[in-house]
Regions:
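Catalytic core of non-heme Fe(II) oxygenases with the double-stranded beta-helix
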Residues: 69-144
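Catalytic core of Fe(II)/2-oxoglutarate
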Residues: 120-193
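Intrinsically disordered, low-complexity peptide-like regions
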Residues: 16-25, 40, 83, 94-96, ...
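Structured loops at beta-to-helix junctions and adjacent beta-edge loops in soluble globular domains
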Residues: 32-36, 46, 85-87, 119, ...
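Non-heme Fe(II)/2-oxoglutarate
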Residues: 1-76
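Compositionally biased, intrinsically disordered low-complexity segments
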Residues: 7-9, 34-36, 109, 118, ...
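Intrinsic-disorder/low-complexity, polar/charged segments enriched in Ser/Thr/Lys/Arg/Asp/Glu/Gln
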Residues: 1, 111-113, 167
Length: 193
């Protein structure tokens, strides 16, 4: 799997806002890199089918060089919402699914999610459940996981008593599948930004 190497001393300087969504409320805060309004505190969508053309980069993307470098690495993805999530010590995001594809009628409407760990700790447990089978995954800094947020239950457990977990969360068009995405998934390389 591809692993990205980058600096993260900028993370703790960001000002996050709590999510109000039912599945993340009181357990996760965020700041937007790309949103519908262009605001760093706009985390949601107004249309059931997210069109990448309706989303714009926020000041976070334009002003923090390291954020831009990480997001630009994924230029092969047609993204909609892009956020950085923050999970404090001892916070738990329960397993849940999202309704991202409830209104999808064609492949063009279908969206997937990629989560990239911005830091790592053995106490940051990414949890996934598909067809009744649960898996706990420890992502190293710079590693990513791609999944269907409607079909795969997903959550997170931050068992650390002192460390905060940060992750880049991107929603993107599943089709057409870009050759660089296939290479990203299948190669076992380290990319230094």
């Amino acid at each position: 799997k591809t692993q990205i190497v980058f600096e993260t001393d900028w993370l703790e300087k960001l000002k996050f806002k709590n999510h109000t969504d039912y599945d993340l409320k009181d357990n996760c805060s965020a700041i937007a890199v790309k949103s519908e309004s262009g605001s760093v505190y706009d985390f949601y969508r107004t249309n059931p089918i997210e069109d990448p053309a309706d989303f714009q980069y926020t000041q976070l993307y334009h002003k923090v060089k390291e954020v831009k470098e990480i997001v630009d690495y994924f230029n092969f993805l047609e993204t909609t919402r892009v956020r950085i999530h923050k999970t404090e010590p001892q916070q738990v995001i329960d397993l849940h699914t999202d309704g991202n594809n409830d209104e999808a009628k064609t492949q063009e409407d279908y969206r997937l999610r990629i989560i990239t760990a911005l830091n790592e700790n053995e106490d940051f447990i990414y949890t996934y459940e598909f067809e009744g089978e649960q898996q706990n995954i420890l992502l190293e800094k710079g590693q990513s996981i791609i999944f269907d947020p409607d079909k795969v239950k997903h959550g997170l457990i931050n068992n650390s008593k002192t460390e905060t977990r940060y992750a880049l969360v991107q929603i993107f068009k599943a089709y057409p599948v870009h050759r660089q995405l296939i290479q990203f998934i299948n190669s076992n390389e380290i990319v230094i930004l």
